Design a protein with these regions (language model features):
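N-terminal signal-anchor/first transmembrane alpha helix
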Residues: 1-34, 104, 114, 118
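Transmembrane alpha-helices
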Residues: 11, 122, 174, 180-194, ...
Length: 298
């Protein structure tokens, strides 16, 4: 194997080492440190300047005080559970919205597909913050939605949507909808229409054929889309902060407040480590699913 090939193969590992493993070790080091009124606001238990003796001192005096604190304070585990619940619910809602859109795009005339694909990708051309702030203008008590419903006479007083979990769901679904549509579209595009006809010829109803053929063959895209939505939604900060307000409890908000408001880097690092461990579960499941799909395709 020549040097250039080794270099190309090693690039992803160097990328992971520099941008994942090293930052993870730094955060883990802070999580094992003690809080201190200083800059930075922690007293490290590992001093690299001491060499091996520093590592020995760390192991001998190792304690997980910050992790124990997270278990004792119900705010944190409630935030984890709330984040999982909100992310899972938003993922299901995104699937319910995204699948019909992807299905419609696949069945649209060929000359329409590039334009429809452009409409799906178009929101990425604008700032994420601007898009979230736009929803504040839509969902507030004096926003466009309430003004329109009041004008129609559908409601007699403004609906309270902003600063609720409903607004958070709307924001997450809108933001991550393309991540659901695109993998489902990629799976449905490979579907042979003759399979549906064959299923109906064998006695399946249209609904039965749709479920047994279309949905089944789109399963890889559905699974990929669900993971692509659930994983970032679990640690979301901006959407619950701007659309959910103080009423929405998510671990991303708690992590932000610990770092920048309370300046308790040690507890915040412990929160981040546990969040990362939670995220490893869907990532591993996603990789196993991808491996099964590759093996099935051989």
């Amino acid at each position: 194997m020549n040097f250039s090939r080794k270099f190309l193969i090693g690039l992803p590992y160097v990328w992971l080492l520099v941008l994942f493993l090293v930052p993870f070790l730094i955060v883990f080091k802070i999580a094992l440190s003690d809080y201190a009124i200083s800059i930075p606001p922690y007293a490290p238990t590992l001093e690299l300047a001491n060499g091996w003796q520093g590592i020995v001192d760390l192991i001998s005096g190792l304690d997980f005080e910050n992790f124990v604190f997270l278990l004792d304070d119900d705010l944190y585990w409630k935030a984890y559970l709330s984040s999982v619940q909100i992310a899972a619910t938003a993922t299901v809602l995104t699937l319910l919205v995204g699948f019909p859109i992807a299905y419609g795009m696949v069945n649209a005339p060929d000359e329409w597909r590039p334009s429809l694909m452009m409409l799906v990708i178009l929101p990425f051309w604008t700032s994420f913050l601007i898009r979230v702030y736009a929803w504040i203008g839509l969902l507030s008590n004096e926003g466009l939605l309430n003004s329109f419903l009041l004008w129609l006479g559908v409601i007699s007083e403004p609906l309270i949507i902003l600063n609720t979990n409903i607004a958070v769901y709307i924001g997450i679904v809108y933001t991550y909808l393309p991540f659901m549509i695109l993998p489902i579209y990629a799976s449905l595009e490979k579907l042979d229409a003759s399979l549906l006809e064959a299923a109906q010829d064998l006695g399946c109803t249209r609904i039965g054929a749709f479920w047994s053929v279309t949905v089944h063959l789109a399963k890889p895209g559905i699974i990929a889309g669900c993971f692509l939505v659930f994983i970032p939604a679990l640690g979301e900060v901006v959407i619950p902060s701007l659309l959910g307000g103080s009423r929405t409890l998510m671990i991303g908000k708690v992590l932000w407040e610990e770092f920048f408001s309370n300046r308790d880097w040690t507890v915040a690092s412990a929160v981040a480590i546990i969040l990362l461990l939670i995220l490893v579960i869907p990532i591993v499941l996603f990789q196993r699913n991808e491996q099964k799909q590759r093996e099935a395709g051989k």
